[in-house]
Amino acid sequence: MHRIFLPIYRFFRNNKGLMYLLLIASTLVFGYYGMQLKYEENIVKLLPRSSTDNELAFSDIGLKDKVFLQITSRDTLNPVEPARLGEAMEEFCALLEKQDEETHHIAGIFSSLDVDMALDAMDFALSHLPSFLDTSLYTGIEQSLTRAAIDEQMEENFQIIQNDETGDGTQLVAMDPLNLRSVLLGSILDESTSMGGMTFEDGHIFCPDKTVSLAFLTPAFDGLDSGKGAHFVQQVQESVKAFEAANPDIHVLVYGMPFDSVSNTATIERDLVLTIGLSLLLILIIMIMSFHRFSFVWQQVVPVAYGAVFALACMYWIKGVMSLMALGLSAIVLGVAISYCLHVLIHYYYVGDAEKMLRDESTPIFLGCITTVGAFMGLMFTDSDLLRDFGLFATFSLIGNTLFALIFLPHFLHKKQIAFKRTHGFPLVEKFNDLPWDRNKWVIGTLLLLIVVGIVMSPRVKFDPDLAHLDYDDEALHEALELYNKKNADGFAHINFAAWDESDMNEAMSYNQDFHAHLDSLQRAGIIKGFSPVSGLLFHSEEDQQERIDAWKAFWTRERVAQLRKDLVASAGAYQLPSNLFDSFISLLREDYKPGNIIEAGIIPTGLLANFYEAQENGRQLFFTDVAYAPEEQNKVWHAVTEADHVIVLEPFFYCRDMVEIIHDDFSTTLWISSIFVLLVLLFSFRNIWIALIAFLPMFISWYVMQGYMAIFGLEFNLINIVISTFIYGIGVDYSIFVMEGLLAEARKGEKSMLNYHKVAIFYSAMVLAIVTFSLVFARHPAIHSIGLITLIGMASTILITYSLQPFVFRQLCKFRFFRRGFRIPEN
């Protein structure tokens, strides 16, 4: 490759102005377009969707993004009265709405239930009575028609009328003298009845023991969008702080998807700033002490920055949008880019001649770039935007960095930088490198034993597809969730499922009815512990309602209605109640009923309705049902429940599990493709199968060794760290290529200096990466923490194999004449 880069160097050396113009112009162009790039912060949108169900689970469904507001007593020994908790919740919700007048982050808050709702709902229910009456309930109704049952109920009716001060009780008795409400809708309309783990008192929502007041906030954005969520979370947290300061006896707890998303993002940012920031400071100090000139530091940083800007511009030209997580993951790939710069700088540090440096280094650097790019480009064969973005950005970063290092960087190298120290080199590093890593039988024997153990154990490494395990468990959010589960979840885990149709509400209602029948069978089989019947009782398709209306007409014959009227008048007379009091009820029995739509009637408050039904902007209709199950049977339950037609679980990570496993399988295939590509490039470059295999050795073996020791230490692959393992592949190729170039120079010409120069550069490259990755071990976020541990294991195996096993195998093969002849190595 020096035949390409040397003429370029000489041309720009004689035309410095043109070189500076090209450098500045390209930097400005790349920087301008790189700044236009948009970032996707929602990790879920970066995963592949293989079906409509998956796509729907990832859509902006308001219920899964709902925020839970809880107000309880700060002093649990002296609890606040429920009435005070309810008032406090109203005040807090009013404060939130006032704070949101300009930002419009809140779509709505459901904090109380209108006391008139029961009468409105009863009026609608009686106007469409047959539609809500399951045929299985006619047996109970028939029992209510006996004279004894009527007399017993009439006594209760009389007591209600006697104690009625507003007239509402009398109206209720007139509309429903048989108390059919207890048969039909008692579990829904009675304010004292628990509904989905909640109770109502004076219109306020409470947990069953009334020690916690509840409210539900619906964000005006996707809960997994941590960008928009950050402003919303800050706004709510400020309101909580102000409200608690004004009400010292009150404790406010908040939990929901937006808070979890923002908490994870903030934790990642803090971890990266602290760990990488401190590690880079340490690296800066070491580099200045080693090179004795600050210019060497910026000469390492600028090419990497140029490559990053070049990559951002390319991403904008190709896609226009990029995964923010892929950008964060790509930061560690910059370690490979620094490695190329180190080889240029350290080689120049020793030889003091830019042309000789290019003659010696252009081929291994370019070859290392090509093979590493091949490893990253293999990610383009996956179905995940996250992996593709990572592969593209890493590829363009390395290309931009390599071009800068070989075209522009040599013009900024001057002999005065190394005049004071050139002949002394790096004594401590050289002493370390001079240790007999490849000649000591104990070192080789121990390494071979460790390699065998790693390879044997490698099949036992596991892959964790559950993205929920990558969440950071914030203390405040954990407290809020724990309180909610303790007070409302009856000891079981709860999750919402949705029956849906693309556009037809009636079809969605039919799917929902079928779904509830499926849930009923699962409950009888003991697979689930229970489910909320609300959506099944309230929402019925026109066809289903018409069938129920026909059954109603068949039950209420003229003879039965006449007998009921006679019995009601007689029973009412015993309490001196008017004989015409129940005329409106008798009229209901004779009414010519038509199917109705309780949603379009608007009698259910929007905040309450959102717990059971949602119509999306694209016309899709969804009906929600809360299902209770034993936590340890989660996977079994989720799969069993979603076997129903047109039903999804409102947990995107459920679908992520299967898709992340697909990504894992894609990744394994990608590694094989990348390996074959790298081996072919090495074979084409060295033109000798034995040399290509030796150069390929560290990358190939280190992958299995890393997996083996992950299994030994109980570490598992996940979506994040498996991507980073590509980096281990890439750096392993680079190190082996540079060592191989040095070994060949030593074997052919007897020049040991080339190998020494390369090993010094490898040492500094490995040191930089080791410091950065070791710092990640101290991160609080589990995803970042796992990256640090796995990268350390991979780096250690790569360095040991490159330093010892690769030279050992090469020197053993050099003892054979066929090997020396095949690669023009002279006889000893």
Give the location of each predicted region.
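Hydrophobic transmembrane alpha-helices and their membrane-interface caps
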Residues: 296-343, 691-739, 804-805
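Pore- and gate-forming transmembrane helices of large, multi-pass membrane proteins
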Residues: 301, 353-382, 696, 748-780, ...
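Extracytoplasmic
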Residues: 166-293, 513, 584-678
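Alpha-helical transmembrane helix bundles of large polytopic membrane transport and channel proteins
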Residues: 29, 83-205, 209-213, 526-604
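Solvent-exposed, non-transmembrane loop/terminal regulatory segments of multi-pass membrane proteins
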Residues: 34-76, 193-202, 433, 437-439, ...
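Transmembrane alpha-helices and their membrane-interface boundaries in multi-pass membrane transporters
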Residues: 317-318, 333-349, 362, 366-370, ...
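Signature of alpha-helical transmembrane segments and their immediate interfacial
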Residues: 1-41, 410-411, 415, 419-466, ...
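Juxtamembrane segments of multi-pass membrane proteins
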Residues: 440-564
